[in-house]
Amino acid sequence: MSLAGTLWAATATAAGPAVPLWLGRRTGRGKEFSARLGERSGIAGLARPPGRLVWLHGASVGETQSVVPLIQALRLARPDLALLLTSGTTTSARLLAARLGGAAAAPERSGALPENPGVLHQFLPLDRPAWVRRFLDHWRPDLALFVESELWPNLLAALGRRGTPAALVNARLSARSARRWALVPGLARQMLGGFRLVLAQSAGDAERLARLGARDPAVPGNLKWAAPPLPADADELARLRTLVAGRPVWAMASTHEGDEALAAAADRAARERFADLLTIIVPRHPERGAALAGTLPGAARRAAGQDPDAAIWLCDTLGELGLVCRLAPLVVMGKSFLPPGGGQNPLEPARLGAAVLFGPLMQNFADIALRLVAAGASRQLAGPEALAAEITSLLNDPPGLARMGAAAARLAAEEAGVLDRVMNALAPLLPAP
Protein backbone atom coordinates (compact mmCIF):
# COMPACT_ATOMS: atom_id res chain seq x y z
CA MET A 1 0.00 0.00 0.00
CA SER A 2 1.23 3.53 -0.77
CA LEU A 3 2.25 5.88 2.03
CA ALA A 4 -0.81 8.04 1.32
CA GLY A 5 -3.01 4.96 1.46
CA THR A 6 -1.53 3.92 4.80
CA LEU A 7 -2.07 7.40 6.22
CA TRP A 8 -5.65 7.41 4.94
CA ALA A 9 -6.38 4.07 6.61
CA ALA A 10 -4.94 5.27 9.91
CA THR A 11 -6.87 8.55 9.75
CA ALA A 12 -10.14 6.79 8.92
CA THR A 13 -9.67 4.43 11.85
CA ALA A 14 -8.84 7.23 14.27
CA ALA A 15 -11.86 9.27 13.15
CA GLY A 16 -14.29 6.46 13.95
CA PRO A 17 -15.49 7.75 17.36
CA ALA A 18 -16.53 11.09 15.82
CA VAL A 19 -18.59 9.52 13.04
CA PRO A 20 -21.85 8.98 15.00
CA LEU A 21 -22.03 12.70 15.82
CA TRP A 22 -21.40 13.58 12.17
CA LEU A 23 -24.05 11.13 10.98
CA GLY A 24 -26.50 12.49 13.53
CA ARG A 25 -26.07 15.99 12.16
CA ARG A 26 -26.57 14.72 8.62
CA THR A 27 -29.72 12.90 9.71
CA GLY A 28 -31.08 16.12 11.18
CA ARG A 29 -30.55 17.82 7.82
CA GLY A 30 -32.31 15.03 5.93
CA LYS A 31 -29.10 13.67 4.40
CA GLU A 32 -29.32 10.27 6.11
CA PHE A 33 -32.21 7.94 6.96
CA SER A 34 -32.22 7.26 10.71
CA ALA A 35 -33.57 3.72 10.25
CA ARG A 36 -30.65 2.85 7.95
CA LEU A 37 -27.69 4.45 9.71
CA GLY A 38 -26.22 1.03 10.46
CA GLU A 39 -25.49 0.56 6.77
CA ARG A 40 -22.97 3.41 6.97
CA SER A 41 -20.88 1.29 9.34
CA GLY A 42 -21.23 -1.85 7.23
CA ILE A 43 -24.17 -3.38 9.12
CA ALA A 44 -26.33 -4.93 6.42
CA GLY A 45 -29.98 -4.03 6.33
CA LEU A 46 -30.88 -7.00 4.13
CA ALA A 47 -29.91 -10.65 3.79
CA ARG A 48 -27.52 -11.63 1.03
CA PRO A 49 -29.31 -13.60 -1.70
CA PRO A 50 -27.89 -17.04 -2.49
CA GLY A 51 -25.70 -17.53 -5.54
CA ARG A 52 -23.55 -15.11 -7.50
CA LEU A 53 -23.72 -11.41 -6.71
CA VAL A 54 -22.50 -8.39 -8.68
CA TRP A 55 -22.08 -5.17 -6.73
CA LEU A 56 -22.44 -1.77 -8.42
CA HIS A 57 -21.59 1.52 -6.71
CA GLY A 58 -22.82 4.92 -7.87
CA ALA A 59 -22.22 7.83 -5.53
CA SER A 60 -25.29 9.97 -6.06
CA VAL A 61 -28.25 10.73 -8.31
CA GLY A 62 -26.32 11.18 -11.55
CA GLU A 63 -24.45 7.91 -11.21
CA THR A 64 -27.62 6.09 -10.16
CA GLN A 65 -29.42 7.32 -13.26
CA SER A 66 -26.50 6.15 -15.40
CA VAL A 67 -26.44 2.70 -13.84
CA VAL A 68 -30.18 1.93 -14.14
CA PRO A 69 -29.95 0.87 -17.82
CA LEU A 70 -26.89 -1.23 -16.97
CA ILE A 71 -28.82 -2.94 -14.17
CA GLN A 72 -31.68 -3.64 -16.55
CA ALA A 73 -29.30 -5.04 -19.17
CA LEU A 74 -27.60 -7.29 -16.61
CA ARG A 75 -30.96 -8.57 -15.41
CA LEU A 76 -31.95 -9.40 -18.96
CA ALA A 77 -28.66 -11.05 -19.91
CA ARG A 78 -27.99 -12.82 -16.59
CA PRO A 79 -31.19 -13.31 -14.55
CA ASP A 80 -29.25 -15.73 -12.32
CA LEU A 81 -27.20 -12.88 -10.84
CA ALA A 82 -28.22 -10.94 -7.75
CA LEU A 83 -27.39 -7.24 -8.06
CA LEU A 84 -26.44 -4.99 -5.14
CA LEU A 85 -26.40 -1.25 -5.77
CA THR A 86 -24.82 1.08 -3.23
CA SER A 87 -24.93 4.86 -3.13
CA GLY A 88 -24.24 7.63 -0.66
CA THR A 89 -27.25 9.94 -0.74
CA THR A 90 -30.88 9.74 0.31
CA THR A 91 -31.94 11.31 -2.98
CA SER A 92 -30.32 8.50 -4.96
CA ALA A 93 -32.03 5.91 -2.75
CA ARG A 94 -35.41 7.51 -3.41
CA LEU A 95 -34.69 7.70 -7.13
CA LEU A 96 -33.77 4.02 -7.31
CA ALA A 97 -36.89 3.09 -5.35
CA ALA A 98 -39.02 5.12 -7.76
CA ARG A 99 -37.39 3.58 -10.85
CA LEU A 100 -37.10 -0.05 -9.73
CA GLY A 101 -39.00 -0.53 -6.48
CA GLY A 102 -42.62 0.19 -7.29
CA ALA A 103 -45.27 1.58 -4.97
CA ALA A 104 -44.35 -0.78 -2.12
CA ALA A 105 -40.75 0.47 -1.87
CA ALA A 106 -39.91 2.34 1.34
CA PRO A 107 -36.33 3.66 0.95
CA GLU A 108 -36.45 5.48 4.30
CA ARG A 109 -36.68 2.09 6.04
CA SER A 110 -35.24 -0.53 3.68
CA GLY A 111 -33.21 -1.02 0.53
CA ALA A 112 -35.58 -3.70 -0.77
CA LEU A 113 -36.99 -3.09 -4.26
CA PRO A 114 -40.20 -5.15 -4.39
CA GLU A 115 -40.75 -4.90 -8.15
CA ASN A 116 -37.20 -6.17 -8.78
CA PRO A 117 -36.45 -8.65 -5.97
CA GLY A 118 -33.12 -9.59 -7.55
CA VAL A 119 -31.86 -6.01 -7.08
CA LEU A 120 -31.03 -4.59 -3.63
CA HIS A 121 -29.93 -1.16 -2.42
CA GLN A 122 -27.65 -0.34 0.49
CA PHE A 123 -25.83 2.79 1.56
CA LEU A 124 -22.08 2.52 1.10
CA PRO A 125 -20.20 2.13 4.39
CA LEU A 126 -17.83 4.92 5.26
CA ASP A 127 -14.24 4.08 4.32
CA ARG A 128 -13.09 2.82 7.73
CA PRO A 129 -11.25 -0.53 7.47
CA ALA A 130 -13.38 -2.38 10.05
CA TRP A 131 -16.63 -1.20 8.47
CA VAL A 132 -15.48 -2.05 4.96
CA ARG A 133 -14.50 -5.53 6.18
CA ARG A 134 -17.92 -6.03 7.79
CA PHE A 135 -19.67 -4.96 4.57
CA LEU A 136 -17.60 -7.28 2.36
CA ASP A 137 -17.89 -10.21 4.79
CA HIS A 138 -21.67 -10.01 4.53
CA TRP A 139 -22.16 -9.36 0.82
CA ARG A 140 -19.19 -11.33 -0.62
CA PRO A 141 -19.46 -9.83 -4.12
CA ASP A 142 -18.20 -11.87 -7.06
CA LEU A 143 -17.59 -8.69 -9.08
CA ALA A 144 -17.50 -5.01 -8.11
CA LEU A 145 -18.40 -2.28 -10.61
CA PHE A 146 -17.66 1.33 -9.66
CA VAL A 147 -19.50 3.96 -11.69
CA GLU A 148 -17.85 7.23 -12.76
CA SER A 149 -15.39 8.63 -10.24
CA GLU A 150 -16.00 7.98 -6.53
CA LEU A 151 -13.13 5.78 -5.31
CA TRP A 152 -12.31 4.87 -1.70
CA PRO A 153 -8.78 3.65 -0.85
CA ASN A 154 -9.61 1.23 1.99
CA LEU A 155 -12.51 -0.30 0.09
CA LEU A 156 -10.48 -0.90 -3.06
CA ALA A 157 -7.54 -2.26 -1.06
CA ALA A 158 -9.84 -4.71 0.73
CA LEU A 159 -11.25 -5.95 -2.58
CA GLY A 160 -7.73 -6.48 -3.86
CA ARG A 161 -6.73 -8.51 -0.81
CA ARG A 162 -9.77 -10.74 -1.29
CA GLY A 163 -9.08 -11.22 -4.98
CA THR A 164 -12.46 -9.77 -5.94
CA PRO A 165 -12.32 -8.48 -9.52
CA ALA A 166 -13.28 -4.83 -9.93
CA ALA A 167 -14.03 -2.61 -12.91
CA LEU A 168 -14.42 1.15 -13.26
CA VAL A 169 -17.38 1.83 -15.55
CA ASN A 170 -18.38 5.09 -17.25
CA ALA A 171 -15.22 6.55 -15.75
CA ARG A 172 -14.62 10.26 -15.88
CA LEU A 173 -11.75 12.37 -14.63
CA SER A 174 -11.72 16.10 -15.28
CA ALA A 175 -8.45 17.95 -15.82
CA ARG A 176 -8.92 19.63 -12.45
CA SER A 177 -9.43 16.30 -10.64
CA ALA A 178 -6.44 14.81 -12.47
CA ARG A 179 -4.23 17.61 -11.16
CA ARG A 180 -5.40 16.91 -7.60
CA TRP A 181 -4.78 13.16 -7.91
CA ALA A 182 -1.32 13.88 -9.31
CA LEU A 183 -0.40 15.27 -5.88
CA VAL A 184 -0.67 11.72 -4.46
CA PRO A 185 0.60 9.62 -7.39
CA GLY A 186 1.22 6.50 -5.33
CA LEU A 187 -2.34 6.42 -4.04
CA ALA A 188 -3.73 7.07 -7.54
CA ARG A 189 -1.71 4.17 -8.98
CA GLN A 190 -2.73 1.93 -6.10
CA MET A 191 -6.43 2.52 -6.72
CA LEU A 192 -6.61 2.78 -10.50
CA GLY A 193 -4.09 0.01 -11.09
CA GLY A 194 -6.25 -2.42 -9.14
CA PHE A 195 -9.08 -2.39 -11.68
CA ARG A 196 -9.20 -5.32 -14.10
CA LEU A 197 -11.08 -3.11 -16.56
CA VAL A 198 -11.53 0.64 -16.98
CA LEU A 199 -14.22 1.94 -19.36
CA ALA A 200 -13.93 5.70 -19.86
CA GLN A 201 -16.58 8.13 -21.03
CA SER A 202 -14.30 9.91 -23.50
CA ALA A 203 -10.82 9.80 -25.00
CA GLY A 204 -9.76 12.70 -22.77
CA ASP A 205 -10.92 10.85 -19.65
CA ALA A 206 -9.05 7.72 -20.80
CA GLU A 207 -5.83 9.66 -21.33
CA ARG A 208 -5.94 11.27 -17.89
CA LEU A 209 -6.81 7.97 -16.19
CA ALA A 210 -3.94 6.19 -17.96
CA ARG A 211 -1.44 8.83 -16.85
CA LEU A 212 -2.47 8.22 -13.24
CA GLY A 213 -2.15 4.44 -13.40
CA ALA A 214 -5.21 2.91 -15.08
CA ARG A 215 -4.32 -0.04 -17.31
CA ASP A 216 -5.35 0.33 -20.97
CA PRO A 217 -8.65 2.16 -20.46
CA ALA A 218 -11.16 1.61 -23.25
CA VAL A 219 -13.66 4.19 -24.53
CA PRO A 220 -17.07 2.59 -25.24
CA GLY A 221 -18.86 5.92 -24.69
CA ASN A 222 -20.96 7.50 -21.98
CA LEU A 223 -23.71 5.44 -20.35
CA LYS A 224 -25.74 8.61 -19.90
CA TRP A 225 -26.63 8.27 -23.59
CA ALA A 226 -28.26 4.92 -22.77
CA ALA A 227 -30.48 6.20 -19.99
CA PRO A 228 -34.20 6.08 -20.80
CA PRO A 229 -36.10 9.37 -21.03
CA LEU A 230 -37.06 10.77 -17.67
CA PRO A 231 -40.59 9.64 -16.76
CA ALA A 232 -43.63 11.87 -16.45
CA ASP A 233 -47.26 11.34 -15.54
CA ALA A 234 -49.14 11.77 -18.83
CA ASP A 235 -52.38 12.99 -17.24
CA GLU A 236 -50.58 15.53 -15.07
CA LEU A 237 -48.56 16.75 -18.05
CA ALA A 238 -51.74 17.28 -20.08
CA ARG A 239 -53.32 19.17 -17.17
CA LEU A 240 -50.32 21.45 -16.73
CA ARG A 241 -50.06 22.12 -20.46
CA THR A 242 -53.64 23.31 -20.39
CA LEU A 243 -52.91 25.57 -17.41
CA VAL A 244 -49.89 27.25 -19.05
CA ALA A 245 -51.21 27.31 -22.62
CA GLY A 246 -50.19 30.50 -24.39
CA ARG A 247 -47.49 31.42 -21.87
CA PRO A 248 -43.79 31.39 -22.82
CA VAL A 249 -42.09 28.87 -20.52
CA TRP A 250 -38.49 28.18 -19.57
CA ALA A 251 -36.93 26.21 -16.73
CA MET A 252 -33.69 26.13 -14.77
CA ALA A 253 -33.02 22.51 -13.88
CA SER A 254 -31.00 20.84 -11.13
CA THR A 255 -30.17 24.11 -9.42
CA HIS A 256 -27.66 24.52 -6.63
CA GLU A 257 -27.11 27.38 -4.21
CA GLY A 258 -26.86 30.66 -6.11
CA ASP A 259 -28.54 29.38 -9.27
CA GLU A 260 -32.00 30.35 -8.07
CA ALA A 261 -30.95 34.00 -7.76
CA LEU A 262 -29.67 33.87 -11.34
CA ALA A 263 -32.98 32.41 -12.49
CA ALA A 264 -34.94 35.12 -10.68
CA ALA A 265 -32.78 37.86 -12.22
CA ALA A 266 -33.21 36.38 -15.69
CA ASP A 267 -36.96 36.17 -15.08
CA ARG A 268 -37.16 39.87 -14.23
CA ALA A 269 -35.18 40.88 -17.32
CA ALA A 270 -36.99 38.58 -19.76
CA ARG A 271 -40.38 39.65 -18.36
CA GLU A 272 -39.84 43.07 -19.96
CA ARG A 273 -40.42 41.29 -23.29
CA PHE A 274 -42.82 38.57 -22.10
CA ALA A 275 -45.20 39.90 -19.45
CA ASP A 276 -46.82 36.48 -18.93
CA LEU A 277 -43.53 34.54 -18.76
CA LEU A 278 -43.44 31.36 -16.63
CA THR A 279 -40.10 30.56 -15.01
CA ILE A 280 -39.76 27.08 -13.47
CA ILE A 281 -37.00 26.35 -10.96
CA VAL A 282 -36.15 22.72 -10.17
CA PRO A 283 -33.69 22.40 -7.25
CA ARG A 284 -31.33 19.46 -7.42
CA HIS A 285 -32.10 18.73 -3.77
CA PRO A 286 -35.85 19.18 -3.20
CA GLU A 287 -35.40 19.45 0.55
CA ARG A 288 -34.10 23.00 -0.07
CA GLY A 289 -37.58 23.99 -1.26
CA ALA A 290 -38.87 25.55 1.96
CA ALA A 291 -35.79 27.75 2.34
CA LEU A 292 -35.84 28.72 -1.34
CA ALA A 293 -39.49 29.72 -1.20
CA GLY A 294 -38.54 32.42 1.28
CA THR A 295 -36.13 33.95 -1.25
CA LEU A 296 -38.64 33.93 -4.13
CA PRO A 297 -41.56 36.16 -3.04
CA GLY A 298 -44.80 35.26 -4.74
CA ALA A 299 -43.52 32.02 -6.23
CA ALA A 300 -45.88 29.04 -6.41
CA ARG A 301 -44.51 25.90 -4.78
CA ARG A 302 -45.13 22.42 -6.17
CA ALA A 303 -44.47 20.68 -2.83
CA ALA A 304 -47.26 22.79 -1.32
CA GLY A 305 -49.68 21.63 -4.01
CA GLN A 306 -49.63 24.96 -5.87
CA ASP A 307 -50.07 25.13 -9.64
CA PRO A 308 -47.90 27.26 -11.97
CA ASP A 309 -50.20 30.29 -11.89
CA ALA A 310 -47.52 32.69 -10.65
CA ALA A 311 -44.50 34.24 -12.35
CA ILE A 312 -42.18 31.60 -10.85
CA TRP A 313 -43.03 27.97 -10.11
CA LEU A 314 -40.70 26.23 -7.66
CA CYS A 315 -40.86 22.53 -8.53
CA ASP A 316 -39.38 21.15 -5.30
CA THR A 317 -40.56 17.55 -5.60
CA LEU A 318 -38.55 14.43 -6.35
CA GLY A 319 -38.63 12.72 -9.73
CA GLU A 320 -40.54 15.34 -11.72
CA LEU A 321 -37.76 16.77 -13.89
CA GLY A 322 -39.19 14.74 -16.78
CA LEU A 323 -42.49 16.55 -16.34
CA VAL A 324 -40.80 19.96 -16.36
CA CYS A 325 -38.61 19.18 -19.38
CA ARG A 326 -41.71 18.22 -21.38
CA LEU A 327 -43.52 21.36 -20.25
CA ALA A 328 -40.69 23.82 -20.98
CA PRO A 329 -39.26 24.04 -24.52
CA LEU A 330 -36.15 25.74 -23.12
CA VAL A 331 -34.12 24.39 -20.18
CA VAL A 332 -31.07 25.97 -18.55
CA MET A 333 -28.74 23.67 -16.62
CA GLY A 334 -27.90 24.55 -13.03
CA LYS A 335 -24.42 24.31 -11.50
CA SER A 336 -22.88 25.57 -14.73
CA PHE A 337 -22.56 29.34 -14.14
CA LEU A 338 -21.08 29.79 -10.65
CA PRO A 339 -17.76 28.40 -9.33
CA PRO A 340 -16.84 25.66 -8.80
CA GLY A 341 -19.57 24.51 -11.18
CA GLY A 342 -19.27 21.17 -12.91
CA GLY A 343 -22.69 21.18 -14.54
CA GLN A 344 -25.63 18.79 -14.54
CA ASN A 345 -26.64 16.29 -17.19
CA PRO A 346 -27.86 18.21 -20.28
CA LEU A 347 -28.98 14.99 -21.95
CA GLU A 348 -32.00 14.74 -19.66
CA PRO A 349 -33.82 17.72 -21.20
CA ALA A 350 -32.23 17.33 -24.64
CA ARG A 351 -33.52 13.77 -25.01
CA LEU A 352 -37.03 15.09 -24.39
CA GLY A 353 -36.81 17.65 -27.19
CA ALA A 354 -35.98 20.73 -25.14
CA ALA A 355 -33.44 23.28 -26.28
CA VAL A 356 -30.67 23.45 -23.67
CA LEU A 357 -28.51 26.30 -22.42
CA PHE A 358 -25.62 26.02 -19.98
CA GLY A 359 -22.85 28.18 -18.64
CA PRO A 360 -19.07 27.92 -18.98
CA LEU A 361 -18.52 25.50 -16.07
CA MET A 362 -19.60 22.13 -17.50
CA GLN A 363 -16.44 20.17 -16.70
CA ASN A 364 -18.29 17.12 -15.37
CA PHE A 365 -20.18 16.81 -18.66
CA ALA A 366 -17.60 18.35 -20.99
CA ASP A 367 -17.77 15.75 -23.75
CA ILE A 368 -21.59 15.66 -23.81
CA ALA A 369 -21.76 19.47 -23.77
CA LEU A 370 -19.33 19.79 -26.68
CA ARG A 371 -21.24 17.25 -28.75
CA LEU A 372 -24.61 18.86 -28.08
CA VAL A 373 -23.27 22.29 -29.05
CA ALA A 374 -21.62 20.92 -32.20
CA ALA A 375 -24.89 19.25 -33.20
CA GLY A 376 -26.83 22.50 -32.80
CA ALA A 377 -28.83 21.06 -29.90
CA SER A 378 -27.44 23.33 -27.17
CA ARG A 379 -25.71 26.64 -26.62
CA GLN A 380 -22.99 27.42 -24.09
CA LEU A 381 -23.02 30.91 -22.61
CA ALA A 382 -19.98 32.86 -21.48
CA GLY A 383 -21.56 33.75 -18.15
CA PRO A 384 -24.78 34.55 -16.28
CA GLU A 385 -24.91 38.07 -17.72
CA ALA A 386 -25.85 36.55 -21.11
CA LEU A 387 -28.68 34.42 -19.73
CA ALA A 388 -31.66 36.79 -19.95
CA ALA A 389 -30.87 37.92 -23.50
CA GLU A 390 -30.47 34.34 -24.73
CA ILE A 391 -33.70 33.22 -23.06
CA THR A 392 -35.56 36.14 -24.62
CA SER A 393 -34.08 35.48 -28.06
CA LEU A 394 -34.93 31.78 -28.08
CA LEU A 395 -38.44 32.15 -26.66
CA ASN A 396 -39.02 34.65 -29.45
CA ASP A 397 -38.09 31.94 -31.99
CA PRO A 398 -40.24 28.80 -31.51
CA PRO A 399 -39.05 27.24 -34.82
CA GLY A 400 -35.46 27.66 -33.65
CA LEU A 401 -36.26 25.93 -30.36
CA ALA A 402 -37.83 23.04 -32.27
CA ARG A 403 -34.75 22.67 -34.49
CA MET A 404 -32.50 22.46 -31.43
CA GLY A 405 -34.71 19.76 -29.88
CA ALA A 406 -34.74 17.72 -33.09
CA ALA A 407 -30.95 17.92 -33.29
CA ALA A 408 -30.68 16.52 -29.77
CA ALA A 409 -32.94 13.57 -30.63
CA ARG A 410 -30.82 12.72 -33.67
CA LEU A 411 -27.61 12.80 -31.65
CA ALA A 412 -29.09 10.59 -28.91
CA ALA A 413 -30.14 8.03 -31.52
CA GLU A 414 -26.59 7.90 -32.90
CA GLU A 415 -25.24 6.99 -29.44
CA ALA A 416 -27.80 4.28 -28.70
CA GLY A 417 -25.21 1.49 -28.97
CA VAL A 418 -23.13 2.46 -25.92
CA LEU A 419 -24.91 0.02 -23.60
CA ASP A 420 -24.13 -2.94 -25.88
CA ARG A 421 -20.47 -1.91 -26.02
CA VAL A 422 -20.25 -1.71 -22.22
CA MET A 423 -21.97 -5.08 -21.77
CA ASN A 424 -19.62 -6.73 -24.28
CA ALA A 425 -16.60 -5.33 -22.42
CA LEU A 426 -17.91 -6.58 -19.07
CA ALA A 427 -18.85 -10.06 -20.27
CA PRO A 428 -15.45 -11.71 -19.54
CA LEU A 429 -15.56 -10.45 -15.93
CA LEU A 430 -19.06 -11.63 -15.09
CA PRO A 431 -19.08 -14.63 -12.74
CA ALA A 432 -19.89 -17.99 -14.29
CA PRO A 433 -23.46 -19.23 -13.74
Functional labels for PLM-detected ranges:
Residues W139-L143, P308-G341:
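Acidic donor-binding loop of glycosyltransferase active sites
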Residues A73, P79, T86-T89, A93-L96, ...:
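Donor-nucleotide binding loops and adjacent catalytic segments primarily
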Residues P20-A234, T255-E257, A270-E272, R284-H285:
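Active-site and donor-binding regions of nucleotide-sugar-utilizing enzymes
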Residues M1-T27, R189:
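Short hydrophobic helices that act as membrane-entry/anchoring signals
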Residues P49-W55, R241-W250, E260-A261, D276-L278:
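Charged active-site motifs of nucleotide-sugar-dependent glycosyltransferases
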Residues F195, R211, R326-R410, A425:
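Catalytic binding pocket for nucleotide-activated donors in carbohydrate/polymer assembly enzymes
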Residues E414-P433:
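C-terminal alpha-helical cap of glycosyltransferases
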Residues L155, D259, E320, Q344-N345, ...:
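Conserved sugar-transfer catalytic core signal across GT-A, GT-B, and GT-C glycosyltransferases
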